[in-house]
Curated annotation (Swiss-Prot):
This is Temporin-1La. Expressed by the skin glands. Antibacterial activity against Gram-positive bacterium S.aureus. It comes from Rana luteiventris. The keyword Cell inner membrane does not apply.
C-alpha cells in the first residue's frame, strides 16, 4: 500500500 494511505489511517486512528 502507499505510504500516504498508511499515514492517513494513522491520523484517523
Amino acid at each position: 500500500v502507499l505510504p500516504l494511505i498508511s499515514m492517513a489511517l494513522g491520523k484517523l486512528l
